[in-house]
Curated annotation (Swiss-Prot):
Cofactor: Zn(2+)
Lineage: Bacteria, Pseudomonadati, Pseudomonadota, Betaproteobacteria, Neisseriales
Protein name: Queuine tRNA-ribosyltransferase
Positions of Zn(2+) binding: 303, 305, 308, 334
Alphabetical GO biological process terms: queuosine biosynthetic process; tRNA wobble guanine modification; tRNA-guanine transglycosylation
UniProt pathway: tRNA modification; tRNA-queuosine biosynthesis
Cofactor note: Binds 1 zinc ion per subunit.
Gene: tgt
Amino acid sequence: MLKFTLHKKDGYARRGTLELNHGKIETPVFMPVGTYGSVKAMNPQNLHDIKAQIILGNTYHLWLRPGLEVIGQFGGLHGFIGWDKPILTDSGGFQVFSLSDMRKLTEEGCTFKSPINGDKLFLSPEISMKIQTVLNSDIAMQLDECTPGEATREQARKSLQMSLRWAERSKKAFEDLKNPNALFGIVQGAMYEDLREESLRGLEQFDFPGLAVGGLSVGEPKPEMYRMLRAVGPILPEHKPHYLMGVGTPEDLVYGVAHGIDMFDCVMPTRNARNGWLFTRFGDLKIKNAKHKLDKRPIDESCTCYACQNFSRAYLHHLHRAGEILGAQLNTIHNLHFYQVIMAEMRDAIEQGKFADWQAQFHENRARGTD
């Protein structure tokens, strides 16, 4: 089940509601990444506290470990991980294609060696749909070939055509399995605007209830990614949700929303938190730096997260230097809370028709820097 309601537009920025089998999502939305069925350093209560509406799970990793037999015993991923809100799963394609020296790609699918035990495994559109049906994610993704950013035009065209054929197979398998959730198609085409349009036109025939933009933030320069967003975001179908996969920084989220994107996921806020890199309204802060050793202030005095309301930079500096798990948890709570606040503020600004003003103030604040 998927129902998308577009409430308001302000330029290309969109304010909507996405209804799924496990609840409603207000968009634009950021989805914390729970690769192995957990968002690193967070428990489900932490996620509820920061007002996360939906999380992402990784099909490839969950298939390898703990496996479908285990997760199937719990009726899917929600029951297994104790999360009652929506979940999106990727198709597993990105991880398989990352194993460039351990995999073989054909029209049928991809053969690869398990990085866990060396077993020979095979992933196809049909198998990806079967895995995601067992996971019972609210949003599943088609299996696509992940085109590298540096692909030549001919490589990108061949790749997107393969992805279109796999989109058709994914949709058929999804329907044959009587999966009650939603399946998204993925727009590919590397850094070529005309190929992105060709991919989008090709996907129209399958009438997916939502569309994702894939193949960005894969090593290309930031101006190139933004050029593709300017080209693709505004031409995505208005009545469907738009998902930008694997992106990104706070500035990337704002740029994406400004060009018609509704949904985002990225490991950056969680990974950076574990490395002591904290996002704030006034720029980024590296908590490991010695200047924080005696600092009694919170990370961000305007922030209402648990970490900022209860702990000093000095304590967080100590925890990080000591390698304490609590440090990673508090840093992660802060970064994910900050991302959720950005999204909530953008939703409000779009509703009020003041997105451009909000965007200008956001960039001014971020450029100011922390002291």
